[in-house]
């Protein structure tokens, strides 16, 4: 039995163990104190203070990375919550599109910085591009963005070539015809004028960026934007599906303005998301054609990117079932999945509408030429023949035609709503053909002479206007939609000398002046949807449903055309008045809205940013302040949605499909 436990036993170290422990302690002390002399000198200078300042400046981001800065922030007072929303949406878009937004594929075309070069070239007048001896290759891939670069000529070209060696891709692009972005274009006070024009052009470009970025933030991939409520909007013409109408409609405007990043975003969305397959959408044949088919065709002409040709054909094929009628006159609406087509119930007993079935020719004819498929041209030629052969009351075309019987509906004639763009496409089909489609020009002249005789009138105050004709009775009202006709008459005068030339130009100038008057007689300096003429009032809306303005472009279209044809400075001045009015009354923090009453000092906004505001309104204003060599009117013809299409025989960007010759059996 143990009296003392083992734990209480006293232990003794041997001398060898004591020496070993002491040696370890000495070594530790040497390492601790000696290491101080090996440290860098952080105390003999202000390094510690500088490190502290770096940490203080870093803020919380050193632990939580800050979100990326917004690329476009013109309004520094913007609510930080909205900035956060924008950043979250950017992340959503990037997740959807992958890394294409940051680094476009190599096939995506152009050398780095190409669009910056374009912006610099836009500041000075550029020469009209000379056509190449041979047309461009039909499909350029998606590498043809540099077509917007202005060619460098003469000594400047030599000096630039010596100081900036070019890649083979750049040399290839310079060998091809160019579509230059021009600048001023007036011999008077060029330095001052060019600076003013550049300022105005850049302002319109900034408006486009504002409209696009807010659409991207709040309605990306949807059809249109509601800026006030910051959510998507979709009109019935697009069905109930998300077709990216603003993307497709506005993309060529981005391209013309040289907005590369935004253009890439739109193109990538079209490639990845745009399709009419597997959706049961009831679409307007007319609206789908002028916006989607027309927009894709323009982008194909600009770039040679086969994506756009394929998409244009894809959309057109979805519209073809609407043409299956006894007369070949298409219905207004078609279901893209079932092919079932119909007309609007309100349209004069199930009739088709003149301005709709008569506004397909430019797109379908060009689509046949670039695909080699004659079907599309055949469809619109059938429409042409029906309208040519049918009896026309007093030489005029009523707005309604029954597609089953081939008989006119109500005898209502208009150069505004329901009729307008049919007459436009008669002249422009002739222009698009290189002035070889004489049938179209003859039909245009016959129609215009009847309109001049039966519908064009002059008010007591000397204002020229186009009235509506209903059952042989004039309605002294002019639609805003009819304001395009000022440019139409002028273009008809400028492209052929005949007995009507002077009258066409006189009426074109008069109508454009009248539409300007409808703007400046409103407190907002923006024109109403329709305006009337009587002994008591001229160029003013009287009914509440006529007093709104929905960002329409027709008046600015005529300013643009008249400027190009006359170089009368007043058209540019009028255009700038419109820019200021749009900025004052239609701009919001999140886009642009129409107005419910242009006669109120502080009008209520309608909360819709129309896709045509980007496609037409801003494009025409931008071109109004650009050089004539930017989309010259003798090389390009604009469809009714302002999508420019090349003129055959005058423009190397026509990109007609090669003709396949029959194989000979001869040995």
From Swiss-Prot:
It catalyses: N(4)-(alpha-D-Man-(1->2)-alpha-D-Man-(1->2)-alpha-D-Man-(1->3)-[alpha-D-Man-(1->2)-alpha-D-Man-(1->3)-[alpha-D-Man-(1->2)-alpha-D-Man-(1->6)]-alpha-D-Man-(1->6)]-beta-D-Man-(1->4)-beta-D-GlcNAc-(1->4)-beta-D-GlcNAc)-L-asparaginyl-[protein] (N-glucan mannose isomer 9A1,2,3B1,2,3) + 4 H2O = N(4)-(alpha-D-Man-(1->3)-[alpha-D-Man-(1->3)-[alpha-D-Man-(1->6)]-alpha-D-Man-(1->6)]-beta-D-Man-(1->4)-beta-D-GlcNAc-(1->4)-beta-D-GlcNAc)-L-asparaginyl-[protein] (N-glucan mannose isomer 5A1,2) + 4 beta-D-mannose; N(4)-(alpha-D-Man-(1->2)-alpha-D-Man-(1->2)-alpha-D-Man-(1->3)-[alpha-D-Man-(1->3)-[alpha-D-Man-(1->2)-alpha-D-Man-(1->6)]-alpha-D-Man-(1->6)]-beta-D-Man-(1->4)-beta-D-GlcNAc-(1->4)-beta-D-GlcNAc)-L-asparaginyl-[protein] (N-glucan mannose isomer 8A1,2,3B1,3) + 3 H2O = N(4)-(alpha-D-Man-(1->3)-[alpha-D-Man-(1->3)-[alpha-D-Man-(1->6)]-alpha-D-Man-(1->6)]-beta-D-Man-(1->4)-beta-D-GlcNAc-(1->4)-beta-D-GlcNAc)-L-asparaginyl-[protein] (N-glucan mannose isomer 5A1,2) + 3 beta-D-mannose. The keyword Signal does not apply. Residues 156-178 have a biased composition (Low complexity). Complex spatial distribution during embryogenesis, including expression in lobula plate giant neurons. Also expressed in adult wing and eyes. It comes from the Eukaryota. Pathway: Protein modification; protein glycosylation. GO terms for cellular component: endomembrane system; endoplasmic reticulum; Golgi membrane. The chain crosses the membrane at residues 19-39. It is an enzyme of class 3 (hydrolase). Residues 40-667 are lumenal. Residues 154-192 are annotated as: Disordered. It is a single-pass type II membrane protein. Keywords: Calcium, Disulfide bond, Glycoprotein, Glycosidase, Golgi apparatus, Hydrolase, Membrane, Metal-binding, Signal-anchor, Transmembrane, Transmembrane helix. InterPro entries: 6hp_glycosidase-like_sf, Glyco_hydro_47, Glycosyl_Hydrolase_47, Seven-hairpin_glycosidases. Ca(2+) binds at residue 640. Its cofactor is Ca(2+); Mg(2+). The keyword Membrane applies. Involved in the maturation of Asn-linked oligosaccharides. Progressively trim alpha-1,2-linked mannose residues from Man(9)GlcNAc(2) to produce Man(5)GlcNAc(2). This is Mannosyl-oligosaccharide alpha-1,2-mannosidase IA. It comes from Drosophila melanogaster (Fruit fly). The gene is alpha-Man-Ia.
């Amino acid at each position: 039995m143990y009296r003392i436990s083992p734990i209480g036993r006293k232990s003794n170290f041997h001398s060898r163990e004591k020496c070993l422990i002491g040696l370890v302690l000495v070594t530790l002390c040497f390492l601790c104190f000696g290491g101080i002399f090996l440290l860098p000198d952080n105390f003999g200078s202000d390094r510690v203070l500088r490190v502290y300042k770096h940490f203080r400046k870093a803020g919380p981001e050193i632990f939580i990375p800050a979100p990326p800065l917004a690329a476009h922030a013109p309004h520094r007072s913007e609510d930080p919550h909205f900035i956060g929303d924008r950043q979250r949406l950017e992340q959503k878009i990037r997740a959807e599109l992958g890394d294409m937004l940051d680094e476009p594929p190599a096939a995506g075309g152009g050398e780095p910085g190409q669009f910056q070069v374009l912006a610099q070239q836009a500041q000075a007048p550029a020469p009209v591009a000379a056509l190449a001896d041979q047309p461009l290759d039909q499909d350029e891939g998606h590498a043809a963005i540099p077509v917007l670069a202005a060619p460098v000529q003469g000594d400047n070209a030599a000096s630039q070539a010596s100081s900036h060696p070019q890649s083979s891709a750049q040399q290839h692009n310079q060998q091809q015809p160019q579509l230059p972005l021009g600048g001023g274009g007036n011999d008077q006070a060029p330095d001052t004028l060019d600076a003013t024009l550049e300022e105005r052009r850049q302002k319109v470009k900034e408006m486009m960026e504002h409209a696009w970025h807010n659409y991207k933030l709040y309605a990306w991939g949807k059809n249109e934007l509601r800026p006030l409520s910051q959510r998507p909007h979709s009109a019935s013409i697009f069905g109930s599906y998300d077709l990216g109408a603003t993307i497709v409609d506005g993309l060529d405007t981005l391209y013309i303005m040289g907005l590369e990043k935004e253009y890439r975003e739109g193109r990538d969305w079209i490639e990845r998301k745009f399709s009419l397959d597997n959706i049961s959408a009831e679409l307007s044949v007319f609206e789908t054609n002028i916006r989607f088919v027309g927009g894709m065709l323009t982008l194909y002409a600009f770039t040679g990117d086969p994506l756009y040709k394929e998409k244009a054909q894809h959309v057109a094929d979805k519209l073809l079932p609407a043409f299956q009628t006894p007369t070949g006159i298409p219905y207004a609406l078609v279901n893209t999945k079932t092919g079932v087509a119909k007309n609007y119930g309100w349209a004069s007993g199930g009739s088709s509408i003149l301005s709709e079935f008569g506004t397909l020719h430019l797109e379908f004819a060009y689509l046949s030429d670039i695909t080699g498929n004659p079907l599309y041209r055949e469809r619109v030629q059938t429409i042409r023949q029906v309208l040519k052969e049918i009896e026309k009351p007093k030489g005029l075309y009523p707005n309604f035609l029954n597609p089953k019987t081939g008989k006119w509906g109500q005898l209502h004639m208009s150069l505004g709503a329901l009729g307008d763009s049919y007459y436009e496409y008669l002249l422009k089909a002739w222009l698009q053909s290189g002035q070889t489609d004489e049938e179209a020009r003859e039909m245009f002249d016959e129609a215009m002479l009847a309109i001049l005789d039966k519908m064009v009138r002059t008010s007591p105050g000397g204002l020229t206007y186009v009235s509506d004709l209903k059952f042989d009775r004039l309605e002294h009202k002019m639609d805003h939609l009819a304001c395009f006709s000022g440019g139409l008459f002028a273009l008809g005068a400028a492209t052929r000398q005949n007995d009507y030339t002077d009258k066409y130009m006189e009426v074109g100038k008069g109508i454009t002046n009248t539409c300007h008057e409808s703007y400046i007689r409103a407190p907002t300096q923006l024109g109403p949807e329709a305006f009337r003429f009587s002994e008591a009032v001229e160029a003013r809306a009287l009914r509440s449903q006529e007093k709104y303005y929905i960002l329409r472009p027709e008046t600015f279209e005529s300013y643009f055309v008249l400027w190009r044809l006359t170089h009368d400075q007043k058209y540019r001045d009028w255009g700038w008045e419109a820019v200021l009015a749009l900025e004052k009354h239609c701009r919001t923090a999140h886009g642009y809205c129409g107005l419910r009453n242009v006669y109120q000092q502080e009008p209520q906004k309608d909360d819709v940013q129309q896709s045509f505001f980007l496609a037409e309104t801003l494009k025409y204003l931008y071109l109004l302040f650009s050089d004539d060599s930017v989309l010259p009117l003798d090389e390009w013809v604009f469809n009714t949605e302002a999508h420019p299409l090349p003129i055959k025989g005058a423009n190397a960007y026509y990109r007609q499909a090669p003709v396949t010759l029959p194989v000979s059996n001869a040995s």
